A protein has these predicted regions:
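N-terminal Rossmann-like FAD-binding beta1-loop-alpha1 element of flavoenzymes
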Residues: 2-30
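Cofactor-binding loop segments of dinucleotide-utilizing enzymes, especially the Rossmann-like FAD-
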Residues: 11, 34, 252
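Conserved Rossmann-like nucleotide-cofactor binding loop
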Residues: 14, 37, 175
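N-terminal FAD cofactor-binding segment of flavoenzymes
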Residues: 35-89
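Low-complexity, highly charged intrinsically disordered N-terminal segments
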Residues: 95-99, 195-197
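Short beta-strand to alpha-helix junction loop
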Residues: 102-122, 258
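Predominantly flavin-linked oxidoreductase catalytic cores and closely associated redox partners
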Residues: 123-258
Length: 258
């Protein structure tokens, strides 16, 4: 039976960061991704931040993927404007929150996660293979069992032979199947969840620049609150990408059930 130091379940940004960091530390780690290709299930997009708090320690993306991350990764636009719009019928009150967002911050870039996660995966897989691990796509975990005497965990899947690890990282999202299989936590209730809906609108780069009064190397983030949510608890967002807009809304799940 194959043995590894760590099994990571889920090929999103969290799982890939874990694989990259563990491999850099010399651990033999394997990442199992249910999708046929890393990134195909990641349709989200937002703003990726790098922070520098005055107190405490934050491990940023460039700490894991290298200080040249900004120049190498498929980022969209550096966000240089942050605006909050409060709506009420035919009135809008706008506030500039740029200074607050830039406080103790290195940068914020708009991103499309299907593109960025593919880049994360290539970098993480290269590091993992050097340590005897790697990424295995198209694999669904169906059982996880713990042997206290051997201090080993056995991973069983639908597609490949079972194998053993010393530790498991559940990085398979908010509806984690690993958490359900292992009873690590109960299912979330509607009061604990938000539902997001996003559309990507294709526009010429120069139209985006002119419409939002930004340059080619800058971007804008617009947040919306008020009656735009039609009496539901939530808010809206609009982020400028290179030649698209990410537009959507996020609602408190239980407010959608009323």
């Amino acid at each position: 039976m194959e043995k590894y130091d760590v099994a990571i379940i889920g090929g999103g940004s969290a799982g890939l960061a874990a694989l990259k960091q563990l491999s850099t530390l010399g651990k033999q780690a394997v990442l199992l991704e249910a999708g046929e290709k890393v990134g195909v299930k990641n349709i989200s997009g937002g703003i990726l931040y790098s922070k520098k708090p005055n107190n405490g320690r934050v491990y940023n993306v460039e700490d894991i993927y290298g200080q040249n991350f900004v120049n190498e990764a498929p980022l969209q636009r550096k966000i240089t404007q942050y605006l909050l719009h409060a709506t009420s019928k035919d009135k809008v009150f706008s506030m500039d929150l740029t200074a607050a967002h830039e406080y103790q911050s290195n940068f914020g870039y708009s991103v499309l996660m299907n593109e960025l996660n593919a880049w994360f995966a290539q970098s993480a897989d290269e590091s993992a293979q050097k340590s005897g691990g790697g990424i295995v796509p198209g694999v669904h975990v169906n059982d996880i069992s713990w042997d206290a005497e051997k201090e080993r965990t056995t991973i069983q899947t639908d597609e490949i032979d079972e194998f053993q690890v010393k530790a498991v990282i559940a990085a398979d999202g908010v509806n984690s199947e690993v958490a359900q299989i292992t009873n690590a936590r109960p299912k979330f209730s509607a009061t604990q969840l938000y539902q997001g809906v996003k559309a990507v609108v294709k526009l010429p780069e120069n139209v985006i620049n002119d419409t939002f009064a930004i340059g080619t190397d800058s971007g804008a983030a617009h947040l919306f609150a008020g009656d735009i949510t039609l009496n539901h608890l939530g808010g809206g967002f609009l982020y400028t990408n290179r030649d698209t807009l990410s537009v959507g809304a996020v609602y408190h799940f239980d407010s959608l059930l009323d």
